[in-house]
Amino acid sequence: MPRLVDLRKKPYCLNDEQIAWVEDTLAYLTDVDKIGQLFVNLFFFGGDAFSGNNLSNQELMNRYHIGGARYMNGSPEQVQGLINELQSYSKVPLLVAANCDSGGDGAVKGGTYISSGAQSEASRDPRIPYLAGLVSAREETALGVNVNFDPCVDIVQNWRNTIVNTRAYGTNADDVIAYTSAYLEGLTAERDVIQCIKHFPGDGTEERDQHLVLGVNELSPEEWDKSFGRVYRHHIEAGVEMIMAGHIALPYYQQRLNPTLKDEDILPATLAPELIQDLLNSDLKLRSKKE
């Protein structure tokens, strides 16, 4: 099957040897293997509190062929032991993610706390978020983590927001761009960590918890383009490798992209093709299509 994206361009930036590895690896994967690569499993220390799964790690890896792993916070020994075990069972090197938005404490118990997004912005010193990114990368990669599910590039327009009120880096696009860029510069200064910004299309405008109910960003297309859109466009042009979609709808923009979309059919970005395929990939050009 021909590639639909150009792996030499952003956000991949692969050389010929790396592209050959990708193609050779895909060639020996079965369809079941490839389906498994789409999923990231959340692991727990002391039992799975959500799914009731009682499979061993080896059984889970052999059955589902997952592409990535995320874990609930554990001790350094627990985290490193889990990652090493999972990697030993995987055909393809696993993507292992942690939420380090303020330092290494997001990767492991006892990790170094540097600064929250709000503290970084309040300092008015880009060196603070730079150090948060630097320490995050040092401590998470020491454990075997290779993907960082931060920073939050959201904009706080509602101080009652329960998710990003202290994790976001400001109340306007300029501050968010400045301080999240500094964080990402620190994150990648010494280590090869995959950058992942969130929560597309943007949290911080409302009070609901998008983890529990549908989040809604009610900005008009024009308002979004001048705020959240500016932030995402900046980071995409800078080469960010991954963007996490939130369980957040952007109804006025979605209906502009798809005029036939009824109110009752509006879905969050995690399920909305007009937001992921049209706005993020086509308009903002997250993925470089092969010419």
What are the functions of these language-model segments?
Residues 30, 69, 99, 125, ...:
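Conserved, mostly hydrophobic/aromatic
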Residues 44-47, 98-106, 146-156, 197-203, ...:
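Short glycine-enriched loops at secondary-structure junctions
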Residues 47-63, 128-139, 223-232:
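Short, acidic/polar
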Residues 75-81, 122-138, 173-178, 222-225:
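Glycine-rich anion/phosphate-binding loops
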